[in-house]
Amino acid sequence: MSYPDDYSTDIEKNKMDLKEFKEKTQIAELESKVLRLELKNKDINRENVQIKKENEILKRELDKLRIPPLILGTILDKVNERKAVVKSSTGPNFLVNLSQFVDPEDIVPGARVCLNQQTLAIVEVLPKEKDYRAMAMEIEEKPDISFEDIGGLNNQIRDIKEVVELPLKNPELFEKVGIVPPKGVLLYGPPGTGKTLLAKAVAYETNASFVRVVGSELVKKFIGEGAKLVRDVFKLAKEKSPCIIFIDEIDAVASKRTESLTGGDREVQRTLMQLLAEMDGFDSRGDVKIIAATNRPDILDPAILRPGRFDRIIEISMPDEDGRLEILKIHTEKMNLKGVDLREVAKIAENMVGADLKAVCTEAGMFAIREEREFIKMDDFREAISKITGKKEKCSYDMPQLTVMYG
């Protein structure tokens, strides 16, 4: 069977087009495959770079683990620019050389250094040692109590401002008059009268650092621990100056010294002697003020009461009727009252301190909640005072008198 010439030409042309299409398809597939391989190669290269980085980090960590530990020592004496006498942590003393990486100016008696295990050469000077317990005593966040939140203590607030706040804020006033600012103040009075509250207000009103210490925290079991903690607290205060040290319940560490031979009493006395030395030591304290509080002034050691240690002793006494009224106004400021005469409440709440009056306000609110009311009546305050007074009668407290007074 024969085909026309045009038909044969078309067949040949179609064959050529099909062949060309197959070639283009193969080329496109190859180009796509090459592109995929290039992308895969880039991913592999990135992974390879990441693995190399991790490998370098692991090598450095491994090298650190292979480095032998250094020996700790303390400088006893500096012989010359390149030699020093060191007491090692293992016990004996050594005359050692300084590494070329150590600045001779940093080598002073008492400095902590690192020694090479083999040659005992000084390879590093460590920063001064700080007691973590003393560091934890610094209050980072200031209390939210101001002098406006304290009622009935206007004279005491004035006195504590003159002793603590004024020297820190306006030291030039004392320079003009030609006197040395007072160093510290002792607050004493019955529990609940606002001694700790005053210290919180001082911390709020001043921009100084605030270190709070409870007297019992300075009493330690082993010999020298309490004295070391006292030194570290004052060292921290100097570094953070201007600074205020508040020692609450100071009678725990500053009670009268006796002839007792028990080990615990002797350690408390050592701590007290270190406290006395820090309060009026050879070195100036700078802008470091001390506030102490106690409700047992009768058992304090006379040595700590003399001027130069506590220049002003302030009694935080029981509030009078006007003082109780001020305190009640502060505590009832946000309370929903109806028909309540605070002056009458202040008269009824005789012999109550600030903490008692705060408890009275809380109890009055609880009585209102118990009766499903959204406001507080006068009867609620009467019942609250009766309840708090009954508790006070069960555990009465007679305030000891401080025979030595000045300031």
Curated annotation (Swiss-Prot):
Keywords: ATP-binding, Chaperone, Coiled coil, Cytoplasm, Nucleotide-binding, Proteasome. Pfam families: AAA, AAA_lid_3, Prot_ATP_ID_OB_C. CDD domains: RecA-like_PAN_like. Residues 405-407 are annotated as: Docks into pockets in the proteasome alpha-ring to cause gate opening. GO terms for cellular component: cytoplasm; proteasome-activating nucleotidase complex. One of its GO terms (molecular function) is ATP binding. InterPro entries: 26S_Proteasome_ATPase, AAA+_ATPase, AAA_lid_3, ATPase_AAA_core, ATPase_AAA_CS, NA-bd_OB-fold, Nucleotidase_PAN, P-loop_NTPase. It is found in: Cytoplasm. Transmembrane segments: none annotated. One of its GO terms (biological process) is proteasomal protein catabolic process. Residues 22-67 form a coiled coil. ATP binds at residues 192-197, 331. Homohexamer. The hexameric complex has a two-ring architecture resembling a top hat that caps the 20S proteasome core at one or both ends. Upon ATP-binding, the C-terminus of PAN interacts with the alpha-rings of the proteasome core by binding to the intersubunit pockets. Consists of three main regions, an N-terminal coiled-coil domain that may assist in substrate recognition, an interdomain involved in PAN hexamerization, and a C-terminal ATPase domain of the AAA type. Belongs to the AAA ATPase family. PANTHER family: 26S PROTEASOME REGULATORY SUBUNIT (PTHR23073). ATPase which is responsible for recognizing, binding, unfolding and translocation of substrate proteins into the archaeal 20S proteasome core particle. Is essential for opening the gate of the 20S proteasome via an interaction with its C-terminus, thereby allowing substrate entry and access to the site of proteolysis. Thus, the C-termini of the proteasomal ATPase function like a 'key in a lock' to induce gate opening and therefore regulate proteolysis. HAMAP family: PAN. This is Proteasome-activating nucleotidase. The gene is pan.
